[in-house]
Amino acid sequence: MSSLRCHPSLVCALLAGAFVPLTGRAQDTTSAPATWRYAQVAPPVVAQHGMVAADHPISSQVGADILRRGGNAIDAIVAVAFAHAVVEPAAGNIGGGGFLVYRQHGGRAFALDFRETAPAAATRDMYVDSTGRVTDDSWLGPRSIGVPGSVAGLWEMHRRFGRLPWRDVVAPAIALARDGHVVDQPRADMLRGSEDLLKRYEPAARFWLPGGRPFVAGDTLRQADLAATLELIADSGAVGFYRGRTADRIVAEMRRSGGLVTTADLENYRPIWRTPLRGRYRGFEIITMPPVSSGGVTLLEALNILAGYRPARFGSAADRHLFIEVERRAFLDRNALLGDPAFVKMPLARLTSTAYAARQRRTIRLDRATPTAGLALHEGPHTTNYSVVDGQGNAAALTTTINHGFGSKIFVSGAGFFLNNEMDDFTAKPGSVNTMGIQQMGEANAITPGKRMLSSMTPTIVLDPRGRLDLVLGSEGGAMIITAVLQVIVNVIDHHMPLAEAVYAPRIHHNALPDSVAMEPAALAPEVKARLEAMGHHFYRNPFYFATVTAIRVTKAGLEGVTDPRVPSSAAGY
């Protein structure tokens, strides 16, 4: 593997300059309320023929270029995912997994589950020590790694729906890895923030901390080993990852470091086509991901509860109180009842029904908070997103993850990528809080060999009341994915915000237990926060991270693409 540090030379500048918006145009900058953290709202990119919104501007441009060359939404989203594995190693991945929601122009919708699975050697209490404490092994190091699903998933969606040759959609990522790209400030910050953890693992430190320090903004990053891995995938499809040289290197790393993933685990991995969940909110149709993602069920339950109330003014105490109470109830069900449908029987029809939502509304007081501990379950539990709309009106929302930034921190020597730490998304011990801040209850998401761990990923497509494509969105950000997607949808439909304003708007988050509300800086006016505290809500301020949404909306002006200011990027279209 080779890497090169340099300050921008002519070659570096030409490489960076090659990735500029095609014929998409930006509207004028607008101002949101001055109290918002992101008060200067960057304009959406507007294009007539196709749009890509991803968490890195290079990834967005790769997808837009595929559309311009005649590729469809699936071609573009596969190309974006592979490019993202190069330019966003902290989150973009081939060592993780994810979910796709895809709607064809004619109206048929599909969902693909390529979530990681527990290795065959995994055991129920593998992260609980002799004192009953959950160890760090669930999120850091080789024992946190699940069997990767990304390459199998990307291959399968392209096999079924892609138009361009497979090699053509992988080729941009190969070029980026081989020729290099300029590291920007946000990605340099991510590396610097993970420096101490990366130092613990020699293969990761050797490449990502050359000379003992991380790459900095302005350096050019070349990844020869990753380019070679992508060449194998381009030549052989999923077989080029799950068998042969790449698989051998993954297994060798597992043996060297003490991980559990074996040759048989890799050979036996399969993605699964599932039926998307569908619901309605104030006349709009919501198409979203079913379990093993918890995102779709939790989103639909929350929207169904909200549908019984008239919207209050955005940011008011009444508005924020209701949101907190709805999130509390939807997450309580999520954390106790949901899991892998191959292992767990779930009451999905009930949880997503309007009758159940009405029952939940009867437990909500509009004048005070309901402590989560007082709610009984009603019996009968680093990510990235890409949104694409092509010229034919096909729409795709894809969310992938390796969980934390740089996943397990285990870097596959000679292959050039990080492996996930998704085993932390299982319930290591009922009642324990995982590193995403979720206290999971019961056994629905317990560790079992071959089982898919519960996810919060929420790729979603929204149709307007006349059945026309309206909105395509998703998010990264752990448990906050669900509430970010929920709030953007409600901001658009209930508060009639333009898409950019809906994404930029301040957010709050409650995942039932622990019983406290996360808030962005300046998310609540002081008098609103005081009123909510008097009602019994408890807040903590999260200054760093609050999920990042990528979204596309169909408007009279064309396709609007918006990315989230919380991790700077840009959409691209033509």
Describe the function of each predicted region.
Residues 9-21:
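Bacterial N-terminal signal peptides
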Residues 66-67, 152-160, 236-243, 248, ...:
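Alpha-helical support elements that line or immediately flank enzyme active sites
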Residues 309-402, 411-415, 422, 430-432, ...:
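Internal maturation/activation junctions in enzymes
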Residues 27-61, 73-237, 241-243, 248-290, ...:
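Noncatalytic scaffold domains of N-terminal-nucleophile
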